[in-house]
Amino acid sequence: MTLQNAPLPSLSWSLVTLFGLQTVLGLVQWRLHPSRQAASTDKGVKKSSSSGDSSSSVFSVLNTSIAIGAVGTLICHIFAVLFGAGIFNQAKETSQLAVYLSLLTFYPASFILGTDLKSWLRIFVHNSPGTYTEAAFYCQGMMTIFGAWLGSIVIPLDWDRPWQAWPVPCVLGAFMFYCIGTVVGLVVSIVMRQRAARSEFGIGPGTGTAQAGSKKNKSE
């Protein structure tokens, strides 16, 4: 049973695997995120009660992320229909594509962004991520959607190949460009960190000239 010959069962198994991997990665990112660490230190939680609080908070974050992922699935399904997918024809395949796209875009970002609607709109609608993590999520999400759209180009071609069945090309394109977006997001995050470090230590274009001018004024 392969993705080409049996799209529905194969996509179902791949979705279960992808959900597990994205959940583990999302929880790890959530625990290591600076905002969570700052919040835990500000509250001054004792070590004796930290385990119970952390377990309850993990379930809370997981429930929130699953809910956001479900909303993301609905949004992806609507956009798939708007871009030409049938409303009733092959609805199961379209739904699985929507779940796949949501697991690659909405679900991982929900562990950090949560229910902060302003952050979601600022990053994905206004195209202005402000932190390294937000830049990585933005690159992953945009590249995933672009890959799914690019994969749909080969569906109407008369090649008569099994992998042209809906929604196999879109899934393959989304996953391939998600991997590319992960690399691009990593590079963008590194560049943003380097620029932030340079500005913090006063290293940047024109800095040396400004410092030399200030020293000259002081000597005069």
At which residue positions do the language-model features occur?
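Transmembrane alpha-helices of multi-pass eukaryotic membrane proteins
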Residues: 5-22, 56-70, 88-106, 132-143, ...
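Canonical alpha-helical transmembrane segments
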Residues: 19-38, 76-79, 110
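Structured partner-binding subdomains within large eukaryotic complex subunits
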Residues: 135-139, 157, 161-204
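Non-transmembrane, juxtamembrane loop and terminal tail segments
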Residues: 40-52, 197-220
